[in-house]
Design a protein with these regions (language model features):
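Aromatic-anchored segments of alpha-helical transmembrane domains
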Residues: 33-40, 102-109, 181-194
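Internal transmembrane alpha-helix with an interfacial aromatic "cap," most often the third helix
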Residues: 10-16, 48-49, 53-56, 62-100, ...
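Membrane-interface helix-boundary motifs at transmembrane edges
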Residues: 16-28, 81-95, 168-175, 222-223
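A generic, lipid-embedded transmembrane alpha helix
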Residues: 30-47, 71-73
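C-terminal transmembrane-bundle signature of multipass membrane proteins
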Residues: 168-230
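Membrane-proximal helix-loop-helix units in multi-pass membrane proteins
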Residues: 70, 80-161
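Juxtamembrane "helix-exit" motif on the non-cytosolic side of transmembrane helices
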Residues: 45-51, 110-117, 189-196
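Hydrophobic transmembrane alpha-helical segments in integral membrane proteins
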Residues: 1-10
Length: 230
C-alpha cells in the first residue's frame, strides 16, 4: 500500500503538471486521490497490528471506505463530464455524474449509520493453505440489516454504471481504456479475491492512474495554447 501510494503520488504530480486546462487538472487529481486512498489503507494495516495505533482504526477504516465506495462513483463521471466536448455525450455523462452523486450520498449515509470494521480473517479453505492462514488482504465487515444489504446491491449496480460505463460513453480518444482497466480490475477481484473485493479492486484499479496520465498527455496535443487554464 505504501509503495503504491508513493508511485501514484508521483504520477499524480506529473499528471497535474502536464494538464493544460481546468478540466484536465480535475481529471489529473485521480492518481493523487488514489495515492491518499492507498496511504490510508497502509496506515490501517499498521493500526491493526500495532495496539498503540488502535484508536486510529475507526477513522482510517471510514476514510478508506469513503474513498473506495463514495468518492469514485462521483469523481470519475464528473471529471469525464468536464472533459467532454460533444454536447450530446456531455449531457449523458452529466446524468452518470448525478447517478454517482446519488450513490456517494447513499453509501455515506449507510456507512455512518451502521458499524463497520476492517479485519484480516483466517482462511480455512484457501487453495494455497492446508491449514488456517492469515490472508494478506483486508476484509471489511458491515453490521447492516438485510434490507440495507439489498440497497447496497442496488448501489453497487449504479456504482459500476457510473465508474465503468461512463468512460465508454465519452468521445475522448483513449478514455475507453479507463473503463477497460476498471472493468478488468473489478472482474479480477471478484473472481480471485472473493471476500476482499473492496480492498483488492481498489489496489488494482489504481493502475488506471497510468491511463489517466496517458490520456492527459494525449489531450495536451489537441489543446490550443490560448485555452490554457480554461
Amino acid at each position: 500500500s505504501f509503495g503504491a501510494s508513493a508511485v501514484l503520488g508521483v504520477i499524480g504530480v506529473v499528471s497535474l503538471s502536464k494538464a493544460k486546462t481546468k478540466p484536465q487538472k480535475l481529471f489529473g487529481t485521480i492518481p493523487l486521490l488514489f495515492s491518499i486512498q492507498q496511504l490510508t489503507e497502509g496506515l490501517l494495516w499498521i493500526s491493526l497490528r500495532n495496539t498503540d495505533m488502535s484508536n486510529w482504526l475507526p477513522f482510517l477504516t471510514y476514510t478508506f471506505l469513503v474513498f473506495a465506495m463514495a468518492v469514485w462513483p462521483f469523481w470519475i463521471p464528473f471529471t469525464i463530464h468536464k472533459l467532454e466536448t460533444d454536447e450530446k455525450r456531455k449531457r449523458l455523462t452529466k446524468v452518470f455524474a448525478w447517478i454517482g452523486a446519488f450513490v456517494a450520498i447513499g453509501v455515506c449515509f449507510i456507512l455512518f449509520s451502521y458499524p463497520v470494521k476492517a479485519v484480516t480473517p483466517f482462511c480455512l479453505n484457501c487453495p494455497d493453505a492446508a491449514t488456517a492462514s492469515l490472508r494478506d488482504h483486508l476484509h471489511y465487515e458491515f453490521a447492516i440489516p438485510t434490507l440495507v444489504k439489498n440497497l447496497i446491491v442496488a448501489f453497487s449496480v449504479l456504482y459500476i454504471a457510473a465508474t465503468i460505463v461512463t468512460p465508454f460513453i465519452s468521445t475522448i480518444k483513449k478514455m475507453k481504456w479507463l473503463g477497460v482497466v476498471f472493468l478488468a480490475s473489478y472482474l479480477f477481484a471478484v473472481i480471485f479475491y472473493t471476500g476482499f473485493v473492496i480492498s483488492v479492486w481498489c489496489f488494482f484499479a489504481a493502475i488506471l492512474s497510468f491511463v489517466v496520465l496517458w490520456i492527459i498527455l494525449d489531450l495536451r496535443k489537441t489543446v490550443p495554447k490560448n485555452t490554457k487554464g480554461t
